[in-house]
């Protein structure tokens, strides 16, 4: 048949059997790997020898034709005419070929046929203990045609349609079966058709991935996830566990039983495998054992066979390069002559083809993952072992990934001076006969794996006692600096601790730490056994590890440390209380020192960033994860430093670190400590501070929801201050806080929050009762005469600090309050008041800011107060409750719940039980909306309103421009009292708002300007002056002292025109006590008559 008919028709020539397995097994690499063994053999003696069975007749079984063909690279052995040889197939007609191929593609194997899927029907017999000749499976029929078989049908090529092989393997001439070896006879005495002795775990031989997500080119997920228990067994275990010959033959037989019955006796393939490998191979007895099962051909039913199989398991001799050490196994010595055919250079293309031919596929799955990574020059991330053994001799190859399996395994053999690189997957095995055998160490079954695993995840602390590994924050920073300076480690740390570090270096140092801290992520779990019982007694052996402390500890407990020069011995208490580290002298020890990230406020140093502590840090990531408060289980130990014959005893204390310390927070705290240390070294001796307890009192008194600044807060008490002066200073400090808060709010463009001052007044002053019956009491009094004018804004003013000083004594209220405080309140209140025009606005603004009446009560309308009568006595147990006696009238403000009311009694607001009172029917209004007009006879004239005037109080009269007003009397030089004719509207109004059109000489009277009371300041009046006239106040000129004397306890600023101004220690003659808690009386100091809160005075 011509050469051009070969791609389209069955060929009359067959390829030699040596190409059969390699061609079928390749996936896209047939041209590269088909000449693996034939070409290698040719390179040895220049020719290729092949035994080609032409037919299976009885005559041809005895005839062996040796064809010498020239070598054409890439196509394998050819015949005399240059046409590649072919093998027989079992297809008689083309349609049968397609039918067979379809069946092969869609064949579904049973679970017990897994071995057949992955064990090919024809193999090289290269096992160590197999017979030199094994039975030939699948004899072919004599009527078979020849068809070339170059690729498996899974390849996408133009010739793929003719490359699929039949389910029956190609025929071969079975040579006579020689006698079996003694050790293999027991396993093959059974009939060749019988199944294996026992069911084999086929998971050992699967190579295809279970799913597409587990697939990696060149690797097998099964090899990685279902690795057999041991890839390395002794010869006895291997022979007992799975006899190579019987298992491989049984797989061939089971495959044969599925496809077709055999014709002829089973024969071995040893002679064929030998002839394919070497021309002189057939002449040497027993030589076939070297290459038994070297290759496992793939049938079309299992195309994924090329990804790797159990060949390395079946033939470890081929996977063991004798060239590595030159000493093959003792079991292979008898065939060492032919081991040279397998000594392929590692870097040659044949070696790559050899590996692609699955010789190393099985066991190199783990090797590839480690050895291929050594090609990359990039150094991998460092593990804990690198931190512990950071020595040059531990890493002969700097490019090796330290976490790789090879390096971890060789670490166990480092004491034996392993001569090969760490990345090598082969380690020597010392055998009993003195010979060493190179074998691949199992990933999970290696002798040192368990020990290595424990070492990775559980580090012995004794190995770390003298280690120079520092895992704390500052220590890593200092370690980095010492490495940059190439100095001795301990000496560099000591010097860095005392050097002045420039400010601009601090961010750089912390940035480097942010890189170094990533390496600590690999720190292993140190276990719980070393974190057991905490002892506060310093151990005497000095080997107890010292616990590192968190840098967060700086921000807490900063005021708890005493003077640095006072050294304290080890704590004798078992209480886990954070205490500051202190030393016995101002000079830092310079001996064996290390650094910690604990709080160092009590240590005298140039930089508090660096502290001298001994030991290692055992604060790992997993410790933080395992313990909510890790550092509370720290160790206590003594660090005895010998420096100039002085013993410096450091106290190792508990840290307040409550979790991970991210680098970002460490950056902040480290900078803060750096600045603080620099500031403390240069600041002057601190002035004497007040009692810290009084500062706390000032904080409690101050309603401002913020703390004092740390630099202004007292830190220590130098001497016992006088109690009264300290109270004044504390209150003055609280007022300064309020002033600062108001200024800050004004800078933001908003007026100060009125609730701040209100809260302060509410804390300092008693509640002011609500006015009720006292409104009528003043008007009923015969002493009700207008005499004294008010300031221009219509409000009765007190000294500017009066609203804020509250309960303070007079000395604190007047003399001790600084001018800045007063001016602040002046401006703030003045600015708030000048925004409004009416007198009532001024008064209400002062009321909101400075009145002590509770907000709930002021905001409660009169109609919402329900009177109730107390049926039992109730005594308040807390400050929120309201006391009353049986028969008292209590005004209910609201219902708290089903058991409690909130109400008012005698000006005080509180809660009381519902069952203690009975509701009363609301009484009729005791007074009209405005006071009745004064009984002044006659009229003094008439006037016309020139401007609109809005009444702000009940005594004022609203006017509209053009209204006619009847003038009843002249209250003072600025106010008229009048009424609008035809209505009952009557009140006072400014003189400047009306134009007098008619005036009676009888009632007109000019009033001189009244003298300003001494409590007023001229600048206050001028700063708050307005165009409005002053409002009158009533006084009693003929004070006879007939009232009951009371003394004022607190300052009180009037908010209505009929109220009396009180100053502390004023004496007031009380004329009447109203039932709403207000008193009516005359002040002996000002000679004014009015009402005032009864709870602001006491009986003399």
UniProtKB/Swiss-Prot annotation:
Keyword Ribosomal protein applies: no
Post-translational modification: Ubiquitinated by CBL. Dephosphorylated by PTPN12.
Chain intervals with Polar residues compositional bias: 30-52, 134-147, 812-824
Positions where Phosphoserine occurs in the chain: 30, 43, 154, 157, 239, 245, 248, 259, 287, 297-299, 301-302, 304, 383, 494, 497, 550, 750, 843, 1017, 1023
Keywords: Amidation, Cell junction, Cell membrane, Cell projection, Cytoplasm, Membrane, Phosphoprotein, Repeat, SH3 domain, Ubl conjugation
Keyword presence, Cytoplasm: yes
Subcellular locations according to the entry: Cytoplasm, Perinuclear region; Apical cell membrane; Cell junction, Focal adhesion; Cell projection, Lamellipodium
Cysteine pairings via disulfide bonds: none
Annotated SoHo domain residues: 66-127
Tissue: Abundantly expressed in heart. In cardiac muscle cells, located in the Z-disks of sarcomere. Also found, but to a lower extent, in small and large intestine, pancreas, thymus, colon, spleen, prostate, testis, brain, ovary and epithelial cells. In the pancreas, mainly expressed in acinar cells, duct cells and all cell types in islets (at protein level). Tends to be down-regulated in pancreatic adenocarcinomas ans metastases.
Composition bias type Low complexity, residue spans: 287-304
Gene Ontology MF terms: cytoskeletal anchor activity; identical protein binding; RNA binding; structural constituent of cytoskeleton; structural constituent of muscle
Taxonomy, superkingdom: Eukaryota
Domain notes: The first 2 SH3 domains are required for WASF1-binding. All 3 SH3 domains can bind independently to PTPN12.
Name listed for the protein in its UniProt record: Sorbin and SH3 domain-containing protein 2
Record organism: Homo sapiens (Human)
């Amino acid at each position: 048949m011509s050469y051009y008919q070969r791609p389209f028709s069955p060929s009359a020539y067959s390829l030699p059997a040596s190409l059969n397995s390699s061609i079928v097994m390749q996936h896209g690499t047939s041209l590269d790997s088909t000449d693996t063994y034939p070409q290698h053999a040719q390179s040895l003696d220049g020719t290729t020898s092949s035994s080609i069975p032409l037919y299976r007749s009885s005559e041809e079984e005895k005839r062996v034709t040796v064809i010498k063909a020239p070598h054409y690279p890439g196509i394998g052995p050819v015949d005399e005419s240059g046409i590649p040889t072919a093998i027989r197939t079992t297809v008689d007609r083309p349609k049968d070929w397609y039918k067979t191929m379809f069946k092969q593609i869609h064949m579904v194997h049973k679970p017990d046929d897994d071995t057949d899927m992955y064990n090919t029907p024809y193999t090289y017999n290269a096992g160590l203990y197999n017979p030199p000749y094994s039975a030939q499976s699948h004899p072919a029929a004599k009527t078979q045609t020849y068809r070339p078989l170059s690729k498996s049908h899974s390849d996408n090529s133009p010739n793929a349609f003719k490359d699929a092989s039949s389910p029956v393997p190609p025929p071969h001439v079975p040579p006579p079966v020689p006698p079996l070896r003694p050790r293999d006879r027991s396993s093959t005495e059974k009939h060749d058709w019988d199944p294996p002795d026992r069911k084999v775990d086929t998971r050992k031989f699967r190579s295809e991935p279970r799913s597409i997500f587990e697939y990696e080119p060149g690797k097998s997920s099964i090899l990685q996830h279902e690795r057999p228990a041991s890839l390395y067994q002794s010869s006895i275990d291997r022979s007992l566990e799975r006899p190579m010959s019987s298992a491989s033959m049984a797989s061939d037989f089971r495959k044969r039983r599925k496809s077709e019955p055999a014709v002829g006796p089973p024969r071995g393939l040893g002679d064929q495998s030998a002839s394919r490998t070497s021309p002189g191979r057939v002449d040497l007895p027993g030589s076939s054992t070297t290459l038994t099962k070297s290759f496992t051909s793939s049938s079309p039913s299992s195309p994924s066979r090329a990804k790797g199989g159990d060949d390395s398991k079946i033939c470890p001799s081929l996977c063991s390069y004798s060239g590595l050490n030159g000493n093959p196994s003792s079991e292979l010595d008898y065939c060492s002559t032919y081991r040279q055919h397998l000594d392929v250079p590692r870097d040659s293309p044949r070696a790559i083809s050899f590996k692609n031919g699955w010789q190393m596929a099985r066991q190199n799955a783990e090797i590839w993952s480690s050895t291929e990574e050594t090609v990359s020059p990039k150094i991998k991330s460092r593990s804990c072992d690198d931190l512990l053994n950071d020595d040059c001799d531990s890493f002969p190859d700097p490019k090796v990934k330290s976490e790789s399996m090879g390096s971890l395994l060789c670490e166990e053999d480092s004491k034996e001076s392993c001569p090969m690189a760490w990345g090598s997957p082969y380690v020597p095995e010392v055998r009993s006969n003195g010979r060493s055998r190179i074998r691949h160490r199992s990933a999970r079954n290696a002798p040192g794996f368990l020990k290595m695993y424990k070492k990775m995840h559980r580090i012995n602390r004794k190995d770390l006692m003298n280690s120079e590994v520092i895992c704390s924050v500052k220590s890593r920073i200092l370690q980095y600096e010492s490495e940059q300076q190439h100095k001795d480690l301990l000496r560099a740390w000591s010097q860095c601790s005392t050097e002045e570090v420039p400010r601009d270096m601090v961010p750089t140092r912390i940035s480097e730490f942010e890189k170094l801290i990533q390496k600590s992520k690999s720190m292993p779990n140190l276990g719980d056994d070393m974190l057991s019982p905490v002892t506060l007694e310093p151990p005497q052996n000095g080997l107890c590890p010292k616990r590192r402390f968190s840098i967060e500890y700086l921000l807490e407990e900063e005021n708890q440390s005493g003077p640095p020069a006072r050294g304290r011995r080890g704590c004798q208490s078992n209480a886990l209380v954070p205490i500051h580290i202190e030393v016995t002298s101002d000079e830092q020890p310079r001996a064996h020192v290390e650094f910690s990230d604990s709080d160092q406020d009590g240590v005298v140093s140039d930089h508090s960033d660096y502290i001298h502590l001994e030991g290692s840090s055992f604060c790992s990531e997993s410790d933080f994860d395992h313990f909510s408060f890790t550092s509370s289980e720290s160790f206590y130990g003594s660090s005895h430093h010998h420096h100039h014959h002085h013993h410096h005893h450091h106290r190792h204390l508990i840290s307040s670190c409550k979790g991970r310390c991210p680098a970002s927070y460490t950056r902040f705290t480290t900078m803060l400590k750096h600045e603080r240390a620099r500031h403390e070294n240069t600041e002057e001796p601190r002035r004497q501070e007040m009692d810290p307890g009084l500062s706390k009192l000032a904080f409690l008194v101050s309603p401002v929801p913020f703390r004092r600044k740390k630099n202004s807060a007292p830190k220590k008490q130098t001497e016992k201050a006088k109690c009264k002066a300290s109270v004044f200073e504390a209150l003055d400090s609280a007022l300064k806080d309020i002033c600062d808060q108001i200024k800050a709010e004004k800078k933001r463009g908003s007026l100060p929050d009125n609730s701040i001052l209100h809260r302060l007044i509410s804390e300092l002053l008693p509640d002011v009762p609500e006015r009720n019956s006292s409104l009528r009491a003043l008007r009923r009094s015969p002493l009700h005469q207008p005499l004294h004018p008010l300031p221009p804004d219509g409000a009765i003013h007190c000294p500017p600090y009066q609203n804020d000083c509250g309960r303070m004594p007079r000395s604190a209220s007047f003399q001790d309050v600084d001018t800045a405080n007063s001016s602040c309140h002046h401006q703030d209140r003045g600015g708030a008041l000048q925004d409004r025009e009416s007198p009532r606005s001024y008064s209400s603004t002062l009321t909101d800011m400075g009145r002590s009446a509770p907000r709930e009560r002021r905001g409660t309308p009169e109609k919402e107060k329900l009177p109730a009568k107390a049926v039992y006595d109730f005594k308040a147990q807390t400050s929120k409750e309201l006391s009353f006696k049986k028969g008292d009238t209590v005004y209910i403000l609201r219902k708290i719940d089903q058991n409690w009311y909130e109400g008012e009694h005698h000006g005080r607001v509180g809660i009381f039980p519902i069952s203690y009172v009975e509701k009363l029917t609301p009484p009729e209004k005791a007074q009209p909306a405005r006071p009745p007009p004064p009984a002044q006879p006659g009229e003094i004239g008439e006037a016309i309103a020139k401007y609109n005037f809005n009444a702000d109080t009940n005594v004022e009269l609203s006017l509209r421009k053009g209204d006619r007003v009847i003038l009843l009397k002249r209250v003072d030089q600025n106010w008229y009292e009048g009424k609008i004719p035809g209505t009952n509207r009557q009140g006072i109004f400014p003189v400047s708002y009306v134009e007098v059109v008619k005036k009676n000489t009888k009632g007109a009277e000019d009033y001189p300007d009244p003298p300003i009371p001494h409590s007023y300041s001229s600048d206050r009046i001028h700063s708050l002056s307005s165009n409005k006239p002053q409002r009158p106040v009533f006084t009693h000129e003929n004070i006879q002292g007939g009232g009951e004397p009371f003394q004022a306890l607190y300052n009180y600023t009037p908010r209505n025109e009929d109220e009396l101004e009180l100053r502390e220690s004023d004496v007031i003659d009380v004329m009447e006590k109203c039932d709403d808690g207000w008193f009516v009386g005359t002040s002996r100091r000002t000679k004014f008559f009015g009402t005032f809160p009864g709870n602001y005075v006491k009986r003399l």
